[in-house]
Amino acid sequence: MMALCMGACSFGDSESHSIVLDTEYQGATIDICSSAVRNYLNLTDEKEIAAYLVDNNRSGQDYMMTKFAWEGDGSTSYTVHFSEKKDFVDEVTYETEDTAIYNQGVFVPGRTYYWKVTGDAQGSDSKVDTFTVLDAPVRYITMEEGFNIRDLGGWKTEDGRMVKYGQIYRGGRMNNRGGNTGLSDEDLRVFRDLLGIRGEIDLRIAGHDDGNQTMSVFGSNVNYRKAPMQGYNYIFPNFKQESPIPRECQSEFVASVGEVFHFLADQNNYPVYFHCNAGADRTGTIAFLINGLLGVSEEDLTKDFELTSFSQGGRRWRSDIVNGEFTANGVMQDDHDNYVAWRHMIEQLMNQYETESGTLSDAIANYLQTACHVTESEIEMIKEMMLENENEK
């Protein structure tokens, strides 16, 4: 897919450069979504969606990898520069001794970028190239040691606005089972320097599955909040079932949902990274509450949830799939290994907390206020920080 030429046309570069770009986009529009994810996002028929999810389960498509390559000029190291501005103000840089990099997460869908390469030899540089990133809405953050990490932004709300990119990120654990960081140095640089994380919410249960984490792996200057919970119907105070597996809400889980939203109402915590272990069930439940509160449709919330199926986490479907169709009970899994009840959770939310408006957004707001003691002013603060205004479009 090509866009208006901006590279050679904009710069009219006739100078001689010692570094020659092998990857030259010349204003092209590039897609940072894998083809498997892009195809899934475009599907609307439920039978086709069910078949596609089965075929692509654990396909490892939860990544954003864009190659940038060049011919070296004898330099021993190179710096690759990216910026949204022609003069490279506020640039992001990558250092390498190779003649190619795979960008891991700096690009935001819908924006135009400029890039160039410089070397450590005197006068070593390339021409400036440019490209535009196709609107996704999915923005994966690709890590060397992590998976299923993505920006919560990019989804359109039912009143026509968009959830901002770069505010909240979701994913899996950042520490290993021994309690230390399982991230590479480059992963930490992405979180600290490129994404600028200032708050971390840990949804895991202390002493049970959290690897004894007590502070942010991103550094002591990052605000860390433990909010232990279980996902899906466990967030409802009256949830209790006897079979097939006895399950029951604990008051701590509901209180933790409240803690999450108290944390999100404080702008000093942004950008925020929230996670459980796999970034699937507990994380998926909180992502549903956040974007649902902001006004994202149930259809898009469901697609965002099911994107985990393309990662090594696998099988996170709106309901079980039998004979090529989603079952009607809204439960994908209910056994000793896991409990996945996406559509059943939404059904119970609407049954218990629906308001006169009949909207999912208002039902979530009602749940947060009545069950979790989140205030109306906190909800408005979150919306203000997370929703795009007219002058930001």
PLM features: residue spans?
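C-terminal motif of bacterial Sec signal peptides marking the signal peptidase cleavage site
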Residues: C5-A8
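Ser/Thr-glycine-rich phosphate-binding loops at phosphate-binding pockets of nucleotides
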Residues: A278-T283
